[in-house]
């Protein structure tokens, strides 16, 4: 049985698979170019709302774009300065943390010996190296540092996108005969991604501020750095908040002792539980349209393809891919598999007859 002119269903499946492999290989090879471009596109999507607002206030487009760029440049400069100075100070403080660690481990070994467990304090100290904290933080911020190093390129691309965005609809209408369908897809992509990024940014900002305030109250060093880390990694679904908590909790144990370390961990747990499990689902609703499994797999996939930035952008990139797949009868079945509710009607795809996907 065939499903297309001259191609069997299996042949079409193999053809799609080969095209996917070639496309992914090309994207991985083009990662140094694609990452700044994708970040610029996402920045432009976020900045469209303030741009439209300033235009309604009768500000010229060039002045509106200039103000937006100055704000972005200021934020990037402050973030880069905070990261750089904090990591330098952190490195200088490591010997002091090492001394505290050895003292704590000696006391722990004595307590264990009193309860019948003979353990060397030096062995415990060697098994918990504070340098690992710096290593974890350094790896996390490596991708951020690379992005900040390309901030000029990202801002230039963002400027051109914002300047061109007003005439984009007219270009689509002139370029495609079936312009309404393409414009509908572009509008859906823009609305969904902009809503997701705007809400996620606000929730991440709230997470970062609460973490920084809580750590400052407890007395953990570099509270602003850990707040910034919580803000950035909150964009990463599922595991971002957990990764953000690890270095701060380790430092709290090392700097202030077990009780304050537990308080730090509890603070992270409460903040992320309230925001991630209660506030975010109510605010986001069904807006993402992606299943939980797909969100987690997209995190792994885009992280492998585009590195740390791919993990940050995994959800919006998968949302875009799903909307694009929905626009074609040939690929709509893939979009259904990516979705959170398998109740859509699939037309075309691998089957000759339309099939209604019914949840179990």
Positions of predicted regions on the chain:
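Hydrophobic alpha-helical transmembrane segments of membrane transport and translocation systems
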Residues: 261-360
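Anchoring transmembrane alpha helix of integral membrane proteins
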Residues: 1-85, 323-360
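Juxtamembrane membrane-interface segments in integral membrane proteins
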Residues: 2, 6, 50-57, 63, ...
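Alpha-helical transmembrane segments and their immediate interhelical loop/hinge regions
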Residues: 12, 145-254, 258-266
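Membrane-water interface of transmembrane alpha-helices in multipass transporters/channels
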Residues: 32-39, 217-229, 256-264, 290-295, ...
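Generic alpha-helical transmembrane segments of integral inner-membrane proteins
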Residues: 17-22, 26, 66-79, 148-155, ...
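Short amphipathic alpha-helical coupling elements at transmembrane boundaries
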Residues: 52-56, 89-92, 96-103, 107-110, ...
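Membrane-spanning helices that line or support transport/gating and their immediate boundary helices
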Residues: 29, 33-37, 49, 53, ...
């Amino acid at each position: 049985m065939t499903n297309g002119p001259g191609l069997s269903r299996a042949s079409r499946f193999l053809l799609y698979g080969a095209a996917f492999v070639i496309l992914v290989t090309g994207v991985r090879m083009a990662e140094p170019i694609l990452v700044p471009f994708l970040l610029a596109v996402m920045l432009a999507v976020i900045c469209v709302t303030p741009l439209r607002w300033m235009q309604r206030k009768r500000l010229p487009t060039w002045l509106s774009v200039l103000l937006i760029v100055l704000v972005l440049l200021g934020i990037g400069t402050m973030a880069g300065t905070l990261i750089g100075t904090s990591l330098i100070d952190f490195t200088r403080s490591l010997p002091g943390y090492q001394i505290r660690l050895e003292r704590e481990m000696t006391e722990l070994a004595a307590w264990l010996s009193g309860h019948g467990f003979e353990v060397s304090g030096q062995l415990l100290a060697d098994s918990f190296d504070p340098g690992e904290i710096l290593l974890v933080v350094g790896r996390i911020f490596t991708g951020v540092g690379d992005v900040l190093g390309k901030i000029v390129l990202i801002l230039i691309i963002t400027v051109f996108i914002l300047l061109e965005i007003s005439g984009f609809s007219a270009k689509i209408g002139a370029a495609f005969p079936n312009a309404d369908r393409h414009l509908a897809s572009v509008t859906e992509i823009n609305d969904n991604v902009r809503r997701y990024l705007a809400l996620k940014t606000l929730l991440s900002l709230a997470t970062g501020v609460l973490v920084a305030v809580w750590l400052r109250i407890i007395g953990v060093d570099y509270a602003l750095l850990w707040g910034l880390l919580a803000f950035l990694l909150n964009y990463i679904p599922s595991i971002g908040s957990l990764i953000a908590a690890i270095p701060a909790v380790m430092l709290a144990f090392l700097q202030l002792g077990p009780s304050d370390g537990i308080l730090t961990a509890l603070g992270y747990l409460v903040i992320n539980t309230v925001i991630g499990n209660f506030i975010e689902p109510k605010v986001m609703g069904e807006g993402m349209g992606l299943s939980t499994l797909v969100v987690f797999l997209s995190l792994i996939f885009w992280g492998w393809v585009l590195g740390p930035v791919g993990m940050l952008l995994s959800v919006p990139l998968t949302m875009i891919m799903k909307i694009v797949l929905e626009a074609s009868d040939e690929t709509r079945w893939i979009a259904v598999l990516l979705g959170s509710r398998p109740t859509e009607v699939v037309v075309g795809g691998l089957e000759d007859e339309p099939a209604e996907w019914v949840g179990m």
